[in-house]
């Protein structure tokens, strides 16, 4: 299916506004349909092209809703996992809403087959207070602590903390760290809504960027 590119059509801006709006809707519908059809057909290459086309279009909510209830092949899910390892952070920033991302990954990623598991996360104290934990947790306390003590968490309002939870099976969407641990993060993707209890193991005070830089430099000299 060819997706019309209204921006590439020089005559587009000379059209009446109603016709411009119609063509924009046509393109948006085509972008969402291309993504939906790729997932439905378990076509990893087409899915990746569709994901790239959806960037900066503000259509992710529609795209996610369009694939709810689908069950693509295991091979397709594995391809999506390999892509997630590379572009997961940018996709999260693009979607901008963790709960929609959770629904998306529940369809695209390999299903978690294990049981309940002890997990850790380094997060801002702000997120802890609001229970708005991120998706990525780890089975490694050391890895989680390094994130808690990192620049992004330490410079957030209120500082940061090292979290621990015993995640039930249904809270774990996928375990990338068990399938592809090239980055050594031992990562688990978790639906925070299904966590029963989350404890704080350590608190780290808030730092300015300059304070953090000086502290890291001092530690490196030891």
List each model region and its residues.
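Conserved NAD+-utilizing ADP-ribose enzyme module
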Residues: 1-117, 125-135, 141-222
């Amino acid at each position: 299916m060819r997706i019309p590119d209204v921006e590439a059509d020089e005559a587009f801006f000379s059209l009446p506004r109603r016709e411009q709006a119609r063509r924009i809707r046509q393109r948006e519908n085509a972008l969402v349909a291309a993504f939906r059809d790729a997932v439905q057909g378990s076509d990893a290459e087409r899915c990746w092209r569709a994901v790239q086309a959806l960037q900066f279009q503000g259509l992710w909510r529609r795209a996610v809703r369009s694939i709810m209830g689908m069950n693509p092949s295991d091979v397709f899910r594995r391809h999506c996992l390999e892509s997630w390892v590379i572009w997961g952070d940018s996709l999260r920033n693009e979607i901008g809403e963790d709960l929609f991302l959770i629904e998306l990954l529940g369809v695209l990623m390999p299903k978690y087959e294990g049981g309940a598991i002890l997990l850790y996360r380094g997060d801002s104290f702000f997120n802890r207070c609001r229970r708005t934990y991120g998706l990525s947790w780890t089975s490694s306390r050391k890895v989680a602590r390094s994130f808690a003590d990192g620049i992004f968490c330490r410079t957030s309002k209120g500082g940061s903390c090292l979290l621990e939870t015993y995640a039930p099976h249904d809270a774990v969407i996928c375990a990338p760290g068990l399938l592809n641990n090239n980055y050594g993060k031992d990562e688990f993707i978790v639906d925070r809504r299904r966590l029963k209890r989350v404890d704080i193991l350590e608190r780290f005070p808030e730092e300015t960027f300059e304070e953090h830089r000086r502290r890291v430099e001092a530690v490196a000299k030891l």
